[in-house]
Amino acid sequence: MMLDEAVGRRVCCDGERGTVRYVGPVPPTAGVWLGVEWDHPERGKHDGSHDGVRYFTCRHPTGGSFVRPQKASFGVDYVTALKQRYEVEIEEVTAEEMKISSKTVVMVGFENVKKKQSVKNLTEVGLRRCEVSAPGPENEIRNTTPFVQSLDLSGNLLSSWEVLAAITEQLDSLQELHLSHNRLSISSAPSSLSSAFSHLRVLSINSCALTWTQVLHCAPMWQQVEELYLADNNITELLRPEHVLQALTVLDLSNNQIAQETVLEISHLPRLERLNLSSTSLSEIKFSDVPAGKKTTLFPALKELLLDDNNISEWRVVNELEKLPSLVYLSCRRNPLLHKEKNLETARQIMIARLGQLELLDMRQILSDERRGAELDYCKMFGSAWLRAGGHREAEKNNPNTDFMTEHPRYLTLIQKYGAPDEGELREQKPFALKNQLLTITFLCPEDLERKPIEKKLPGSMIVQKVKGLLHRLLKLPGVELKLTYTCAKMADREIEIDNDLKPLQFYSVEDGDKILVRWS
């Protein structure tokens, strides 16, 4: 390659990748220099200026530096990288004989392994960080790897979408393409390259310094893409996709600082089923097209929503999510909202009760027993507030005010499902404090009346397994299988079974002053 063609090319130097922005002299030194803007600004020294003279421009004040051409690698073509990556493996794996203690041992079946490992038969090719920068001789890719369906070119030296298209147009079966950690210059005519990506279904372009405007500009190249991964880019606001991205079922926008008022711009994508908005600084989302308790027309197909590591701090945001008509999976970990409750398990139960269609929360399945327990507990927890707001156990008198229904849009549905809680079951949410978490529990052994009752103060968050461990020590019954039930003053004639060792006491609505009955065989 001639150096006068180097501007815009990608280079690698000591493991760091960058883009050539200048070629020429840098007085007072002799010879030719490359002015490089590095992907990682900490690798650079300046912004493209030296001794008061500007040679090129960088986005970061320390993103640039000068290197000698002989120290920079401009990469290799696809087929060269393929041979370097795979033929070495084949030579290592497919030797038909190996020497052990001076004897020759024949490796039976290695001919089949060799055939399987043949480059031409590959359907998946991984060339991550192999310094691929060009397609190579005409049609050589098509002749070398004709059956490739999945290709990983992450972290290479591809300089433009045109160069990439020269590779992919030779891969007629390509459906999955990984391009993360590349810096591709944006094509001026993206539609003209669409034939090179006509079969593409999955595209990963994480960490490529792209804006949403650039994504929409490039989108005509890949009209058939169903899964698009755009994590850790420069996406700060969203615009409504017009005539592009309409086939998307999966969209990952995580690790982008997105203006939350623009999130609804993608709510009209008709097939979008999975959306990742984790680590986007999101604190609010509102579907104003419908009131509380109704289903929105936005995000009509959305089944899975990831909101981890955001700034969500109010339950009203969860109420808004209940408006999504198809939502069955939510991940909302590490948000301030979760710390407003006594513990994470309590927050989980409230979230389950507020989201009636949910089947999976934070990667844990919601079983029918857990949902029932969560919804019953929710009814008790907010029953007093319901009564104060105008609620009544008699249906014709039940008319809670608008404020309550806005804050608890599922409450009427739940009391229709389970019945209104009895007055003795109502309990207020108490402030988060250790003393409010401790329950005074009396342990009784009904089948061994010689044992005296034992009174203990335990946190409601204590799981049943640990309670049993405590009882093994207190009762001096190591290794014995314990069966627990409990009674309360409100239902003194009824025993409620505690049958899941991994649930906390509060899951069973065990309250201060209740009695736990201990049996063993």
From Swiss-Prot:
Residues 24-68 form the CAP-Gly domain. PROSITE patterns: CAP_GLY_1, CAP_GLY_2. InterPro entries: CAP-Gly_dom_sf, CAP-Gly_domain, Leu-rich_rpt, Leu-rich_rpt_typical-subtyp, LRR_dom_sf, Ubiquitin-like_domsf, Ubl_TBCE. It is found in: Cytoplasm; Cytoplasm, Cytoskeleton. GO terms for biological process: microtubule cytoskeleton organization; post-chaperonin tubulin folding pathway; tubulin complex assembly. CDD domains: Ubl_TBCE. Residues 335-377 form the LRRCT domain. One of its GO terms (cellular component) is cytoplasm. Keywords: Chaperone, Cytoplasm, Cytoskeleton, Leucine-rich repeat, Repeat. LRR repeats lie at residues 147-168, 173-194, 199-220, 224-245, 247-268, 271-292, 301-322. GO terms for molecular function: alpha-tubulin binding. It comes from the Eukaryota. Supercomplex made of cofactors A to E. Cofactors A and D function by capturing and stabilizing tubulin in a quasi-native conformation. Cofactor E binds to the cofactor D-tubulin complex; interaction with cofactor C then causes the release of tubulin polypeptides that are committed to the native state. Tubulin-folding protein; involved in the second step of the tubulin folding pathway. Belongs to the TBCE family. This is Tubulin-specific chaperone E. The lineage of its organism: Eukaryota, Metazoa, Chordata, Craniata, Vertebrata.
